[in-house]
Amino acid sequence: MKRNKWSILLPLLILAVGFATFIISRPVSISVRLADEAPLSAVASITAKYPVDVTVRIAGKHDDDLETHVSSYAVQHEIPVLGLYPGTANEVTILLTTEDGKTYERSIIVRTEPLPEIFPEIKIERHNPDLIAPGMTFLHLGHYAEDGGFTPLPCAIDSYGEVRWYYTGTIGHIMKRIPSGNFIIQDGNTLVEMDLLGNRVAVRAEVPTGIHHDMTYTADGRFLILSSAPDSFEDGVVEVDGSSAEVLRGYDFRAILDPDRPPQPKNLEPLDWLHLNGIDTSDSDNSFIVSGRDQSAVVKVDRDTGAIRWILGNHTYWKNAFLQYLLAPVGEPFSWQWGQHAPMVHPEDPHRILLYDNGNERSYTDPVRPEDNYSGAVEYYIDEKRMEVRQIWEFGKEYQGETFTPFIGDANYLDNQNRLITFGGITRNLSGAPIELFDFEQMSINRMKVAAHVVEVTDENPAREVMRIIIEDPDPASYRGYRVYQAERYPLYQKN
């Protein structure tokens, strides 16, 4: 009988060592090495005698295996193994197929360490599991110690609350995926491209005036990055070439808006009149939108000229030169946003804007108390020809002070039309009552216990809650807590 080319594989020897390395005897050699700064990721190095394509399957606990396929035929492959469970003997199956259709399959065990003790217990309420948008929820999570010290814990969880990826390296505010499937992360005044193994691929931007809060990637391959205008504070945007990292131009918002307009909500930093905290691109008309927290304003700006297209926000204290740009509210119900974060242009309809409305005080003259206030997501429809704005959707008001979030927050459109809303900085005193961020009598940040809820809802009016992620410290007598700066829904393995 004619032997096929895989018959000499038997007997096979599989070796498992502490560093999760496995060798299978020739003509196929497979080694799996855990990543250094992404401990739930690994690299499978495969050498075969004949050209093969490769499928890697990571067994899930809930009939939800992860799979990636490399269709190119080669004798050597380096395949990312993503989505391993912590503290688990993970089953990973590798399927090799030759050009003439013969296959070879081998399952191996990859052991991982438990999560660091600082990680929270993540609770999941799955209200409508069939409606959950696919992918992992990437959380820009962080832990507050009793003394206020902060530790970033960026991670990704599945729809059962299991951590399936986390990163231990240096990171600032920014963690955004780009079309290549890699991430852009902030390291000081630098934006670095990083893969899901935690490898730094390239420096994509270096901004001498600083980087903070957010960035967006344009259709023509550039980064728009929140920075500071020269000798100022968090009131600038820079445009950077995505390949060369060259700074192409800057936008000084002291020359675009009115730095003398009174801030609301206020801040402890005297120079912080605007506090840019979110940016998105509107590629259909070569513009971008930014969120200025301390002006409670979202502004659309022409990329070429830096001219204002419109201003979304309350009409109080604007000088005459800006009145022509103020959008007029139409229809009921309608509420202005206050202290907002994370504006997002709808991916199919540039007239629609979704943002997170923190709701700080909601007035210049008659502030709403935290226990009577609310935070949430709100969607507006903007008619630029008429310079009008209509509120078309909202979620969060029904929870009032229970999820009041005076700082940070996020709101995203999902691919299945759902929305992902991040009540990322729910602040309470040790009695459990909601509180504001600052104590202006003492000119200090309030002592507070911080928690986060990330909620997926439908786009209906009223919205139906699909899933809720609850991240809280369990000790009511401690100031230890957790925040989520932003949350995004991405697949671990991105199909390009």
Language-model features: locations:
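Short beta-strand segments within Ig-like beta-sandwich modules, predominantly Fibronectin type-III
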Residues: 68-74
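Membrane-interface motif at the C-terminal end of an N-terminal transmembrane signal
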Residues: 18-30
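Short, solvent-exposed loop/linker segments at beta-strand-coil boundaries, enriched for Pro/Gly
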Residues: 62-64
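Histidine-/acidic-rich catalytic cores in large beta-rich domains
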Residues: 28-54, 58, 77-78, 89-496
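Positively charged n-region of N-terminal signal peptides that target proteins for export
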Residues: 1-6
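Hydrophobic membrane-insertion alpha-helices, especially the h-region
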Residues: 8-21
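Short, flexible loop/turn segments at beta-strand junctions in immunoglobulin-like
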Residues: 81-86
